[in-house]
Amino acid sequence: MPAKSSGTTKPYLHFIGGNAASVTGSCTIVRFNNIKLAVDMGLIQTNNLVADYRANRDLMKKIKPKTIHGVIIGHLHADHCLGLLAAVAMGMQAYIYIPQGSIPILKIMMEDCIKIMAQDSLKMQNKHGIKAPPLATEGDIDKVMQWLVEVPFGVSTAIVGGAKLTYYHAGHIVHSAQAVLEIKQGYSIKRVGFTGDFNTEAKSVSVPPIEPLPRCNIVVGECTYSDPTRCYSMKKDRWYDEQVINAAIYQYNRILMPCFSLQRAEDILDVLWHTRATERKIDGQMIPVYLDSPLAYRIYKAWPDVLEYEDKLNLRLIESWEESQAVQQSNECAIIIASSGMLNAGRALAHLKYILPNSCNAVLFSGYASPNTIAYEIKHGAKEIMLDGELIQNNAQIYCLNTFSSHANYNQLMQYYQQIDYDRLCLVHSEFSNKVEFAHTLQDTLVKQGKSSRVVAAQQDQKVWL
């Protein structure tokens, strides 16, 4: 049974998750009519195994899963949805609303997450002498599955507490959604919008273009790229990115492309095919493209567009660790696509040990990297990288591809938040200093346009009354 409601209070938002201070661990609590909803339930993911474990455990204690009446999920990236496993493990019994079509991929994501949690628990015990039982186990997958409710896009749907939920396409990744929550309070109706992660420029045939949110009293909006240097022209810079990929394939021996398993890996395969760069032949054969990620492998097999790149590219899908090790230790000319994109986990780290020391190799980054990740260190010129306790020399060639990100860039954020209508905009999902500056700039722009909308940079644990 869902949690019982108790007490009465004026409706408010509580910025409880890590997305109030950074770009990971998304969760915002909505309180109304004695109901407690969570919008997103993500995991905190940085480059510190022990710190992440403790942060996720502490976040769950703050959320108090047993008191949650419902959860609204915007999309399936781990930092937005895989905290569901820890929540049900701690007793949450609540309906979980997700965009239509999401269930097959969510199940794959959860199965992979449970394996990683178990592995991380062993690492903390063996390497750090810390007893840290997994925050969730295999049985918790079924607990999540039994509470899932798929909600169609564009349909006002009644949910727990008498509220109504409408999903709008976000343009971020497959099945990604913005959410609008309509809450009846006395004789009035409050409308709260959540952009989640979004992109205003379509980049993949599997992702419908963004639908602007309707007028809302409050919008909780992401601003990942609130740094004004994060500007690019999709048409011009995609051409540049394709030229970089083409040149790298012909110039370097081994190319590592760290990426997220969901959406990014598939987008990279699509670009590799369309650039025709992989038609470079060695001994009469196209150079191999390795997709080395168990999660990406399973998502690839379940992808809605039934991508079949085995025939288009010399694509080799790697599932077992033994196969991965053979690829890592080989010196053949190859392109290796492996997770994770920020190099805070996954097989990309194992490949990195072999790729970095050799100046004949290259690393091509294709997305955002938080300041506390290995990807950030490398992108910012670090010549020595600590990998699994070993100091590795970085002699490889490093490139950053700007147009693969599934987030809106600085200019697109500015344009979108001027386009939609709201009384208040609460900014989340950004490095805090950038978010504050972005809020000031946007507020000044709105004032010059004669608009009365207010913009605030949400702070950790802040409550905002509706």
Residue ranges and their predicted role:
Residues 20-25, 32-94, 98-146, 200-208, ...:
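Pre-active-site segment of Zn-dependent metallo-hydrolases
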Residues 118-122, 127, 300-316, 372-396:
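Acidic, Ser/Thr-rich peripheral helices and adjacent loops at domain boundaries
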Residues 241-373, 428:
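Hard-cation-handling environments
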Residues 110-173, 305-332:
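Metallo-beta-lactamase
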Residues 201-291, 362-363, 367, 385-453:
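Cap/insert and terminal regions of metallo-dependent hydrolase folds
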Residues 2-66, 149-207, 327-328, 346-347, ...:
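Core dinuclear metal-dependent hydrolase active-site scaffold
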Residues 233-237, 313-325, 341-344, 379-384, ...:
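A general structural motif
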